[in-house]
Design a protein with these regions (language model features):
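His/Glu-rich zincin catalytic helix
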Residues: 1-62, 171-274, 313
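Charge-rich, well-structured scaffold segments of protease-associated domains
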Residues: 60-212, 219, 245-247, 255, ...
C-alpha cells in the first residue's frame, strides 16, 4: 500500500493488485455529522442524490448511460461520519470511470430542475427506512437516550426536514465540505502507482481548495433508561442497548474490542452462549464496538419473541452486572491472544472484501 497527498490536499491510497478490474472509492468528510454546523438534517444525504442529477457538461441521462457503459458496479452512500462514491471497472476503463466521477463530484449543476422529483424519492426512502425494524429500534434508542448528538436523528432526516430542503441549502453544504483537503480517494488496480497518481492528478488535481475547516464532533453521555415502542406490524421483539465509548485512548479502544469478542462478538461469547446456545431464547444476539467518528459506542442487539423479552434482558443485565463486579470476566492470556488473532482475521477478511 502506498499513500501520498496531492498539492490541493486530496489524499490518495493505492494498492496494486494483478487483476482485470480496477476499483476506486472517494470518501469525503461530509456525512450527516457535518449538519451539526447549522444545516437541516438530511442535507448530506440529499446532496449525494442530487450530484447524480447532472453536471455542467453532462445531463442525468448522460451520467446514467456512461455508468452502464463503464461500471460493473457503482454506488454512493451517506453515513454519519462520511459520504462515499465508489465503482469497479475493467482495467481498460479505469480512466473513464475516474473522469465521470470527477465530473460528478467537482462540477455538479445543482439546479432546481429535478429537485422536487429527487425529494420524492427520498420521501419513499424514508418510508422504507421505517419498515426496517432493526433500524427502527436503533432510531428509537438514539432518539431517546441522547439529547443533542446528531445520531439522535436519522441520517436521511425526517419528513419535515426533507420537505424544508432546497437547492441553496445543498449548495451551501457542498461549498463548505466538498473540498479536496476534506477528502480521500483509494484505488485498487493493476496499474502502477505512477500511472494511477498521474490519472488522479489529471482528474482531481484541479479541484480547488476551499476554506480550511476546523472540524469537531459533539459527544455526550447517554441518558440511562428503558424505552419501549409498540410496532403494530411486528411479530417479535427487537432489543438494543448502547454504551458510550468516546474519549478512549487507542490502547483502550483495542482493549474494548478484545473484551467485546468474549462479551458478545463471537459464537463462544457470554451473551451468545447463555441466551442462544444454552437456552434458545433468541435467534440473533450479539454485541458490536462501533469506532466510527460520531458514534463511538458499544451496542448489544437481540431479536426474540414477546414472551421471552424479560428473560433475555434479565440475562443481559445479569452478565453486565457480573462483569462490573469482576466476577464474570477474567480471561487468561491464551483467551486474549485467541481474541486478538480472530480480530486480525476478521479485519483482513473485511479489507479483502472491500477491495473486490
Amino acid at each position: 500500500v502506498r499513500k501520498t497527498t496531492l498539492k490541493n490536499g486530496l489524499r490518495l491510497i493505492y494498492e496494486k493488485r494483478e487483476a482485470n478490474i480496477s476499483s476506486f472509492c472517494i470518501g469525503i468528510d461530509a456525512g450527516a455529522l457535518r449538519e451539526e454546523d447549522g444545516f437541516l438534517f438530511g442535507t448530506a444525504h440529499a446532496l449525494e442524490h442530487m450530484l447524480y442529477k447532472g453536471t455542467k457538461s453532462r445531463s442525468e441521462d448522460d451520467i446514467n448511460r456512461l455508468s452502464d457503459e463503464i461500471f460493473g458496479f457503482s454506488n454512493a452512500m451517506t453515513n454519519y461520519p462520511y459520504v462515499i462514491y465508489y465503482g469497479t471497472t475493467l482495467a481498460v476503463s479505469f480512466e473513464k470511470g475516474l473522469d465521470l466521477y470527477s465530473d460528478i463530484i467537482l462540477n455538479p449543476s445543482l439546479k432546481k430542475d429535478g429537485f422536487s422529483e429527487e425529494m420524492k424519492i427520498i420521501e419513499e426512502e424514508l418510508r422504507e427506512w421505517a419498515d426496517d425494524l432493526p433500524q427502527l429500534c436503533e432510531d428509537k434508542l438514539f432518539r431517546n437516550c441522547f439529547k443533542s448528538r446528531r445520531i439522535k436523528e436519522r441520517i436521511i432526516g425526517s419528513q419535515d426536514t426533507v420537505a424544508a430542503l432546497d437547492v441553496d441549502e445543498l449548495r451551501r453544504f457542498y461549498e463548505k465540505f466538498y473540498i479536496p483537503q476534506n477528502s480521500v480517494i483509494s484505488v485498487v488496480t493493476s496499474q502502477s502507482f505512477e500511472e494511477t497518481l498521474m490519472l488522479v492528478e489529471k482528474y482531481f488535481g484541479g479541484w480547488g481548495k476551499g476554506k480550511e475547516l476546523c472540524l469537531s464532533t459533539l459527544y455526550e453521555e447517554n441518558k440511562a433508561g428503558t424505552y419501549i415502542d409498540n410496532a403494530c406490524n411486528m411479530e417479535g421483539v427487537k432489543i438494543e442497548y448502547c454504551f458510550t465509548l468516546h474519549g478512549l485512548t487507542p490502547d483502550e479502544e483495542k482493549a474494548v474490542s478484545l473484551f467485546n469478542f468474549h462479551f458478545g462478538g463471537s459464537v463462544t461469547s457470554m451473551l451468545y452462549d447463555e441466551i442462544r446456545t444454552k437456552r434458545g431464547l433468541a435467534y440473533e444476539i450479539s454485541s458490536k464496538v462501533r469506532k466510527e467518528n460520531g458514534l463511538k459506542l458499544l451496542t448489544i442487539y437481540a431479536n426474540t419473541s414477546r414472551e421471552n423479552v424479560d428473560r433475555v434482558t434479565g440475562i443481559i443485565d445479569c452478565i453486565i452486572e457480573g462483569i462490573r463486579s469482576g466476577k464474570a470476566y477474567n480471561p487468561d492470556m491464551k483467551q486474549i491472544e485467541r481474541a486478538e488473532d480472530m480480530l486480525k482475521l476478521r479485519r483482513e477478511l473485511f479489507l479483502e472484501k472491500s477491495k473486490q
